[in-house]
Amino acid sequence: MELLSALSLDDLAVAFSKLPVFPLFDVAYYIISILYLKYEPGAVDLSKRSPVASWLCAMLYCFGSYILADVLLGESPIHYFSNNANILLASAVWYLTFFCPLNIFYKIVSFLPLKLVLVGMKEVVRVRKIAMGIHHAHHHYHHGWVIMVLIGWVKGSGVALMSNLEQLLRGVWKPETNEILHMSFPTKASLYGAILFTLQQAHWLPISKAYLIFFFTLFMAICKIYMTATHSHGSPFAIFESGICCVLFGAANGDHDDHGDHHHHHDDHDVSHSTVKSKEELNEGTRKRKTKKAE
């Protein structure tokens, strides 16, 4: 904290943490979220065939994190839909993205320089949602660290954790795409961010919430902008995760491969052994036939 104070970032961090996200940053969040929905196979056909189903999918993309968090906390899952301004903004973005004449709106927001700006703005909303989720869970469960992490993670992950439900609305069923089994970078980052904010809320992390919001938003924005610009699907955490998992949980894949190789070599040995045995039996039979002919 003394180092951060020496950098004179106090005012900047506090001002950034108090920066309102509505409507500018929220609109950016809706644009990028619904843009990703349009990238999904069959999403455009669905919007023409069943606009209601397409709109519901768009609302899940925009507000799925609130719905799932409310369900986990025992609150009404449709509570957030009482925010008329947000619903109208998200609906307007959905309509323009799918039904704007000549696809003008889609082409504008897909323009890479503008898209990178919108991606960075979306991460501002994501981190703010994680922080608010931790605060909300702490209000209900003061010492429930796991609950705080879970709610913060859900708030930050958005619709990713509800991807199977969203796919059902589109008439698609892909259980192998379960986000928990194959976490994307935003889902992993939201989990790690939720852990950091929970530690800060419990006063185990010696940093103010304003600083944590500022630096974690900076990290998320830089990573997502870089990944979007380079069309990368890798994770910056991959190197650390592989090392930590190897130490804590062992090289599961390597052991499995070694086990498989052992069986493979054993099978090869059995096959070669049986082949040699068959050749020996064949030669023995040939010798017996020759002996009979000679007799």
From Swiss-Prot:
Keyword Aminoacyl-tRNA synthetase recorded? no
Q: In which residues is a 1,2-diacyl-sn-glycero-3-phospho-(1D-myo-inositol-4,5-bisphosphate) bound?
A: 122, 126
GO BP terms: regulation of release of sequestered calcium ion into cytosol
Q: Which sequence ranges are marked TM in the entry?
A: 12-32, 52-72, 85-105, 145-165, 179-199, 202-222, 234-254
Bilayer topology: Multi-pass membrane protein
* Activity control mechanisms: Channel activity is activated by a change of voltage within the sarcoplasmic reticulum lumen and blocked by luminal high Ca(2+) levels.
Residue intervals annotated with topology Lumenal? 1-11, 73-84, 166-178, 223-233
Kindly list the positions annotated as binding Ca(2+).
74
User: Which parts of the sequence are annotated with region: Disordered?
Assistant: 259-295
InterPro entries noted in UniProt: TRIC_channel
Its cellular-component GO annotations read: nuclear membrane; sarcoplasmic reticulum membrane
What is stated as this protein's family in its record? Answer: Belongs to the TMEM38 family.
**Name listed for the protein in its UniProt record:** Trimeric intracellular cation channel type A
Lineage of the source organism? Eukaryota, Metazoa, Chordata, Craniata, Vertebrata
